[in-house]
Amino acid sequence: MADAAASPVGKRLLLLFADPTASASASAPTAAAVVSGDPGPALRTRAWRAGTVRAMSGAVPQDLAIFVEFDGCNWKQHSWVKVHAEDVLALLLEGSLVWAPRKDPVLLQGTRVPVAQWPALTFTPLVDKLGLGSVVPVEYLVDRELRFLSDANGMHLFQMGTDVQNQILLEHAALRETVNALISDQKLQEIFSRGPYSVQGHRVKVYQPEGEEVWLCGVVSRQDSVTRLMEVSITETGEVKSVDPRLTHVMLMDSSTPQSEGGTIKAVKSSKGKKKRESIEGRDGRRRKSASDSGCDPATKKLKGDRGEVDSNGSDGGEASRGPWKGGNASGEPGLEQRAKQPPSTFVPQINRNIRFATYTKENGRTLVVQDEPVGGDTPVPFTPYASATGQTPLAPEVGGAENKEAGKTLEQVSQGMVASAAVVTTASSTPTTVRISDTGLASGTGPEKQKGSWSQASGENSRNSSLASSGFGVSLSSLSQPLTFGSGRSQSNGVLATDNKPLGFSFSCSSASESQKDSDLSKNLFFQCMSQNVPSTNYLSRVSESVADDSSSRDSFTQSLESLTSGLCKGRSVLGADTQPGPKAGSSVDRKVPAESMPTLTPAFPRSLLNTRTPENHENLFLQPPKLSREEPSNPFLAFVEKVEHSPFSSFVSQASGSSSSATSVTSKATASWPESHSSAESAPLAKKKPLFITTDSSKLVSGVLGSALSTGSPSLSAVGNGRSSSPTNSLTQPIEMPTLSSSPTEERPTVGPGQQDNPLLKTFSTVFGRHSGSFLSAPAEFAQENKAPFEAVKRFSLDERSLACRQDSDSSTNSDLSDLSDSEEQLQAKSGLKGIPEHLMGKLGPNGERSAELLLGKGKGKQAPKGRPRTAPLKVGQSVLKDVSKVRKLKQSGEPFLQDGSCINVAPHLHKCRECRLERYRKFKEQEQDDSTVACRFFHFRRLVFTRKGVLRVEGFLSPQQSDPDAMNLWIPSSSLAEGIDLETSKYILANVGDQFCQLVMSEKEAMMMVEPHQKVAWKRAVRGVREMCDVCETTLFNIHWVCRKCGFGVCLDCYRLRKSRPRSETEEMGDEEVFSWLKCAKGQSHEPENLMPTQIIPGTALYNIGDMVHAARGKWGIKANCPCISRQSKSVLRPAVTNGISQLPSVTPSASSGNETTFSSGGGAAAVTNPEPDQVPKGAGTDGRSEEPLKAEGSASNSNSELKAIRPPCPDTAPPSSALHWLADLATQKAKEETKDAGSLRSVLNKESHSPFGLDSFNSTAKVSPLTPKLFNSLLLGPTASNSKTEGSSLRDLLHSGPGKLPQTPLDTGIPFPPVFSSSSAVAKSKASLPDFLDHIIASVVENKKTSDPSKRSCNLTDTQKEVKEMAMGLNVLDPHTSHSWLCDGRLLCLHDPSNKNNWKIFRECWKQGQPVLVSGVHKKLKSELWKPEAFSQEFGDQDVDLVNCRNCAIISDVKVRDFWDGFEIICKRLRSEDGQPMVLKLKDWPPGEDFRDMMPTRFEDLMENLPLPEYTKRDGRLNLASRLPSYFVRPDLGPKMYNAYGLITAEDRRVGTTNLHLDVSDAVNVMVYVGIPVGEGAHDEEVLKTIDEGDADEVTKQRIHDGKEKPGALWHIYAAKDAEKIRELLRKVGEEQGQENPPDHDPIHDQSWYLDQILRKRLFEEYGVQGWAIVQFLGDAVFIPAGAPHQVHNLYSCIKVAEDFVSPEHVKHCFRLTQEFRHLSNTHTNHEDKLQVKNIIYHAVKDAVGTLKAHESKLARS
């Protein structure tokens, strides 16, 4: 819930309803009047209604309503007011108490008292359809005179300590009483709603909105210290009512005034009991719920659950709670100068110091913080203070910038009692997407009256919500799916600014009613609403104080100048031109208007000619060219809005410059002439290549802090242009501009490559594609070398040592202070920054893209970001921050150049938004970790750009973009020019053949992700950080590339979680609350993270991923490697594919779009020219024996989701059956159906350019499935393919099914009742609701082609026997493969057993069985090991004193804190074993020992002994050539692949046969498990007979039994392993059995992953009879190594005491299962050990394919010779 300050209950309210008789534009004159400088009369004459909020209701913004008791009305006339009703024009909520200037005398007791200042209440707009802008509504006390002041000058916060003694108060008792009453009421509301107080036992009266009596009197019998809910015993009736003081007005009836300590009301500290803390610690912070989550209504519950996230004690500034101003007091705050002079009335943000947090560190290194019971229940709540809904209030830092903050500080100091007076005193829990209609200074006057369906309407709505949120309507806001926070809105929104023609300065209705609006669909986009506030004029206080020209004429001239400059845009030109060419260039659009927002605030020194600007219109989205976005929209300031040029989607982008970016030299009309200078599409690519973006040049050559002649001439340089910089970034990202950043991260080690790396042709190829990475990277452009005289050295990291106090007092950067921590958004921050300090002589050369160019020039360069999933390796050393060097800091301040954040948020700037990791640092239990470690863990490390304002205050400037990469960053992601180690030509082919399809699906998934990026959004680039694994904060899957990040806290979500949340209706999301499986963490102050507010971010720089995809297709075509990838642009089918001979007519299904023989881009995207592939691939014609003809390598603009698979055109086989074939018509029907549907799929470009097309509505066909265009794919359906077990399960057409013949059609888990899958079933497990042709045909074909499932077990058994015979014959045939490999066959010929673990040729025969998904046994490994190392006595002697946990295998009970010696001593001696309560010796197993990844460190000798002697080293060794995990560069966190030990006693008795040592489960990776020791226990009789019986009942085969009798070998454990494809059937059986036993089946649990089942003989029999599933029963003897395929369910039953050691690996054959399982594991609860994705399968696949492609490319000469 919300605190007092956040809740509107009990506050004064001003309402203005629409006059039904007035015209729609009636309010326009009001706005105009406001702009003209005298807002008072125009606004005062409206029919304002004042009253007090007595109650509120509504769980979602649309339903939010308040009960208002209007002044001067009787009780019957009081009513509920729907906050967002159409007739509500303005809703203003009480803010702070201030001293406001007053001209008219006050009438007191019949006498007129002239006063200069008078106490007044400020009001903050929650709903503002009038466009109040910077107007400050105030209501003077006593006479309640309402005034609208044009600015906050002359106002200052009422100080309780000193102002109570003010002469005016002492002289006028009525005023004094009014002030005291007001303060008292505010104190009471705070007491009721928050703080270390309890009103238990006090008499109160509760308001009854709709009761017969207005007030009910009673006594508080109980008040919850956390939720603040109180139980009131009603005096009259005696009933007990539960009252929430934040929703219903409660007043204290006691005469005494509550006091904080020792008064009538005592502070109550909440318990700090260990038990409470432990119970909370045990849960994942993300799933946490507050103590009282149950038992209250959903809205309350949600709010409580959302209570602040971690950072509620705001140490470094404002993180915990906002002062009233911050929240949104519209009341004026002193002007800049005034405030600077003001005494320490500056706010000190309220800090909730009473919140306690329990922390614990997870295995991945991430610290989770769980909010424990706050002391006294002083919890921050989601009610956000409201960051002024209309940017007018300095309170909204976003609006007022630092000044606001400072102002806020001033205000907040008020008195303890006044804490609650500000509507925003509380933490800003507002959601990040707050949007408001009128931003500071450019409040769009366009009210709803102007455009119902467009911008203003949307903004209006948002401004309402946001204001609500901030003002404290937070009640339901935190749970709203709608973003509500004001300042925060910006930073969370991506994309184009709302460019309504809005006014400059603080004008309000700047755009004339007649001006055309944007497309109405844009108005619905929250992003645009947010961006509408993203204006440069960030501080209306400073504007006012600087006498900002606010007359309408200036506005008109502004718009005119904007229009006149539309010709300035020239596409495709490099930003740095050689000379100025006057006149517009071709490609400019003359009729375009540039929004006023793109301009900084006008000040007298800011000539209007500076307004001649263009806003960027180009898109950076790799695949989306904005369908027909209104071209007026400027781009997201965070990342340049770029346009694609020629090749790469991310290559030379050009953003238009905005006026503010031009320097003083371009102030005149000459500015336009300079624009084209650097824009010529013909030159853009070459220039991009010639001029480096990252330059580690001599300090003397870098941009200097010298301000150009602008200063001397009196015209402002950019640094002096208002407070804000143009909100629209300009300048092509490809600009080779010198960056004051390092070319490589301080912690980054360059990838290990051969000596030829610098001349890497691949790198050059990529450079060409990206338009940047060329050899000239290290040379700076000549003009730069000449122009930049002042020295500047590369920046690294930053500390606060040299920071002056001014940074806290400086109003220009209030956005950076704590107060703005949540209410301010990055966009606004950027808008405020302006391009400070750029020499004017440089700006003249920056052209129309000046601002963007300047940004790059100033250092928006590469860098790395510290990721999310904090698992990391050994601490890394980070170089000294640049800010440790005073001279560098001075130069940075002079030049205003942006630089990368090179330290943790805490060390760099505590007053800026802190990332999640840095927020948690202060709560970590173990502070002794190295500072460098926490620095690298910072999520903004080398990701966020910072800049000093002209006042020397640090603020956020933006984030890196994908184009701002350097060769070192790119080298990590592209093939090395030299041969990769450990991979040869044949291995490369094999890897590509097995992994190429998965890689292609991965690329398709990334394209799908890019299509989800809105056209207006900009993609950021988060550089990989050495030793840190990027993880999704929701499902803990490793982030591969595209993901979404919160700009404020670094919260990141993967594609799947993002899509899942975005596709779900908001109402459903709110209802789910914390109980959903994938619940999202809150932002800094408990604000909800809304998908639309997150910033799309990629990890792989540039277009490397898509180019590797092209290379994969090219390589497979050139080398004749089989391919079955689903993308339409894939190469020809494998030459190995046999011709179909089943008699069905062979009709090619090549689509017209694929008919071109030329290769087109694999990654072609929306409107971009195709990326030129390094080498066009030529598929050899006639290759192979099937006579296939050449197939186009790629299809132009192939649909990203892939159309139906292209089939190679082959001539009909000689034995083709006649057309009269019984199935001929079915086959042709299916083919025709596929062709028709394929036609509709269209190319990627056409699909993406459909303006109305939803990101989910791509009509596409997977090679294996048709995805319903209306069904959002909840998970990586393209990635995973249609089934869990077989990527080829579903045919690309009915024809494939018909060709399969009886007995060949696999069964999918989705359709277990049908012998084969539906022809075009959806790849997501969506219930088929409509009968369709494929469904209908299923039944026909089932009867014609395939035998129905046999229900008769005897028949099934017979069928299986035949199948087994076939398998056995096939297996035996493998003997021919390598007669020299000693092996045998177990399990009736289904299990390969290799006898010589050291045979170098084992891998050949092993691979044939392994690729079939079969387990393999290798015997005799123990003969190679040093047996003395693996004996129980050795372990007991070396590690006996360690404390461990044991598990009782019989009942799964855990025995904690036992010495490991106790376990080992009873390993073979039963009498020494620990005993249970009934006195029986327990069957124990060691739990996680050695712990985690400690095996190698704890037992180095054993580690070496094991790794040297593992069989099949090609697969099992860490650097094995077929172990794909070895391809992952050391730069990344290596997956934990073991070894792990499994030590347990044997289960000997008959009763034990029903339990397992290790229950049924499966692993995401392949594994080899070696039995290194078998201990046969002594004492209490022999157990050999029982063991033999267990083996016999375990279905072991005769050959296995002979090993016991004839070979005298020691049996250790009985395994049951099942094929990965049978996992779903096993689940089905276990669910069925569970239901029979009355067990529940929660959604985040899985019968296999839960490891709660052991399949005993009865269950195994049922599985076989009911589902036809038969596994492998394997007895593992001493020295046997069992190879378990990834995804294969298996269980273990120890026959005797065993020591087993397992090592994991990733084989090419089973990568598809790794893919699928990673998705499965996402759905598990956090308690599952497999929940977290440690394998990083996508990264492994990427780098394996990258190395394979590089190797093949290096061997192409051989191909040419052959």
Curated annotation (Swiss-Prot):
Histone demethylase that specifically demethylates 'Lys-9' of histone H3, thereby playing a central role in histone code. Demethylation of Lys residue generates formaldehyde and succinate May have tumor suppressor activity. The keyword Ribosomal protein does not apply. Its EC number is 1.14.11.65. Residues 253-350, 426-468, 574-613, 713-763, 806-853, 1146-1217, 1285-1306 are annotated as: Disordered. The gene is Kdm3b. Residues 299-310 have a biased composition (Basic and acidic residues). Belongs to the JHDM2 histone demethylase family. A zinc finger (C6-type) spans 1032-1057. The modification Phosphothreonine is found at T615. Residues 426-435 have a biased composition (Low complexity). It comes from the Eukaryota. This is Lysine-specific demethylase 3B. Residues 1499-1722 form the JmjC domain. A motif (LXXLL motif) lies at residues 1294-1298. It catalyses: N(6),N(6)-dimethyl-L-lysyl(9)-[histone H3] + 2 2-oxoglutarate + 2 O2 = L-lysyl(9)-[histone H3] + 2 formaldehyde + 2 succinate + 2 CO2. Leu-Xaa-Xaa-Leu-Leu (LXXLL) motifs are known to mediate the association with nuclear receptors. InterPro entries: DUF7030 (IPR054294), JHDM2-like (IPR045109), JmjC_dom (IPR003347), KDM3AB_Tudor (IPR054503), PWWP_KDM3B (IPR054504). GO terms for molecular function: antioxidant activity; histone H3K9me/H3K9me2 demethylase activity; zinc ion binding. It is found in: Nucleus. There is a cross-link at K789 (Glycyl lysine isopeptide (Lys-Gly) (interchain with G-Cter in SUMO2)).
